[in-house]
Amino acid sequence: LKCYSSRTETMTCPEGKDKCEKYAV
Protein backbone atom coordinates (compact mmCIF):
# COMPACT_ATOMS: atom_id res chain seq x y z
CA LEU A 1 0.00 0.00 0.00
CA LYS A 2 1.18 3.50 -0.70
CA CYS A 3 0.24 6.74 1.01
CA TYR A 4 1.36 10.35 0.88
CA SER A 5 2.95 12.34 3.66
CA SER A 6 2.18 15.97 4.32
CA ARG A 7 4.99 16.79 1.90
CA THR A 8 3.23 14.68 -0.75
CA GLU A 9 6.14 12.26 -0.74
CA THR A 10 5.21 8.69 -1.53
CA MET A 11 5.27 6.62 1.63
CA THR A 12 4.78 2.90 2.26
CA CYS A 13 2.15 1.53 4.63
CA PRO A 14 3.40 -1.71 6.20
CA GLU A 15 0.91 -4.60 6.15
CA GLY A 16 -1.45 -4.60 9.12
CA LYS A 17 -1.15 -0.86 9.61
CA ASP A 18 -3.79 1.64 8.53
CA LYS A 19 -1.60 4.68 9.05
CA CYS A 20 1.48 5.55 7.05
CA GLU A 21 4.79 5.20 8.79
CA LYS A 22 7.87 7.13 7.81
CA TYR A 23 9.04 4.54 5.32
CA ALA A 24 10.20 6.21 2.15
CA VAL A 25 9.56 4.29 -1.05
From Swiss-Prot:
Main location (coarse class): secreted
Q: Does the keyword Lipoprotein apply?
A: no
Q: Which Gene3D superfamilies match?
A: CD59
Q: Name one GO cellular component term.
A: extracellular region
Keywords in alphabetical order, please: Acetylcholine receptor inhibiting toxin, Disulfide bond, Ion channel impairing toxin, Neurotoxin, Postsynaptic neurotoxin, Secreted, Toxin
Report the superkingdom from the record.
Eukaryota
The listed locations are: Secreted
Spell out the disulfide connections: 3-20
What does the entry state regarding organ or tissue expression?
Expressed by the venom gland.
Under the heading InterPro entries, the entry gives: Snake_toxin-like_sf
Annotated GO molecular function terms are: acetylcholine receptor inhibitor activity; ion channel regulator activity; toxin activity
Give the family from UniProt: Belongs to the three-finger toxin family. Short-chain subfamily.
Entry function = Binds and may inhibit nicotinic acetylcholine receptors (nAChR).
Q: What's the name of the protein?
A: Nicotinic acetylcholine receptor-binding protein Mnn-4
